[in-house]
Regions:
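Nucleotidyltransferase catalytic core that binds NTPs
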Residues: 1-195
Length: 195
């Protein structure tokens, strides 16, 4: 059965870790399409550059990755970005067999997500490994959510330990970021003085 992966994030900015994850997801034979979905107003974040800039950077950072397309669906929804609302919207638009891609850190805290139980009924979860998350803790969280009907696959994808937050801090210190960002994204950030 072919599936559509939902890869959401703030992408503030998109970096090589995101690209690594997308390439790994694209290599999964059952994945037909990957919707890269920038968040409109992340409920837990406030220091975010405009949606227009983040979409432009995503287009540059992820161009050429098989099966990927930038989706503006979440950006066009009213109010704050909640995964459950986005999944309901995608279902109405005919997206069947969605797979929500999240990090191991998110799985461990998934019960804190807004209407998480409803999310579990709407989408399968693909989980990529994250530095600092013990495998035993990850497997325990997986088991607990599966008791609630979740379908969860732990991917053998271990992205580089890089975060958008660290990149923004590094910009403030004028550190070299050539190894963390695609060259055209770095140029775009500098041209628009985003961070």
């Amino acid at each position: 059965m072919k599936k559509t992966a939902i890869f959401g994030g703030t992408f503030n900015p998109p970096h090589i870790g995101h690209r690594f994850m997308l390439e790994g997801i694209a290599s999964q034979p059952e994945i037909e399409k990957i919707l890269i979905m920038p968040a409109k107003i992340p409920p837990h974040k406030s220091d975010v550059v405009s949606a227009e800039h983040r979409v432009n950077m995503c287009k540059m950072a992820f161009c050429g990755i098989e099966k990927c397309e930038i989706s503006l669906e979440e950006l066009n929804l009213p109010g704050k970005s909640y995964t459950v609302n986005t999944l309901h919207h995608l279902n109405k638009k005919g997206i069947k067999n969605p797979v929500l891609v999240i990090g191991a850190d998110s799985l461990v805290n998934f019960y804190k997500w807004y209407r998480y139980d409803e999310i579990l009924s709407l989408a399968e979860l693909y989980v990529y490994k994250r530095e600092g998350i013990d495998v035993a803790i990850l497997l325990s969280a997986k088991k607990e959510l599966e008791k609630q009907g979740a379908k969860i696959t732990i991917l053998d994808i271990y992205p580089p330990a890089v975060s958008s937050t660290d990149i923004r801090v590094a910009f403030g210190k004028a550190e070299n970021l050539k190894t963390l960002l695609e060259p055209n994204v770095l140029k775009y950030i500098n041209e628009h003085s985003l961070y």
